[in-house]
Amino acid sequence: MWKIFEHKKSIKQINSLPTEILKRYEKWKDIVSISGPNGLKQIKGFNDEPLVGEWKGHRSSRLNLQYRVIYKIENELFFVQVVKVTAHDYRRK
């Protein structure tokens, strides 16, 4: 079982998501908590992939064509940190 930690800033973003995206995010959390990032790779719709550049070390999963979850796996210890849920804006703020 994987633990999901939502960063303080990401909680604000999550609370302001449209209902459809919020439901998809909850489904994403269910999959990750049960089978981890490998479970996301088996579902093509999430298009889970590693990021490069200033987000190196993080991963991105697609919630729909516009919204992404940016997260990081900490020390392979079944711990996922959600850093950002964004409408495809990858700039660090």
Predicted segment positions?
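PIN/NYN-family metal-dependent endoribonuclease catalytic core
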Residues: 4-8
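A short, surface-exposed loop/turn module that caps and links secondary-structure elements
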Residues: 34-62
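N-terminal first-folded block
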Residues: 9-43
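Enriched for short, Lys/Arg-rich terminal
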Residues: 1, 11-16, 20-22, 61-93
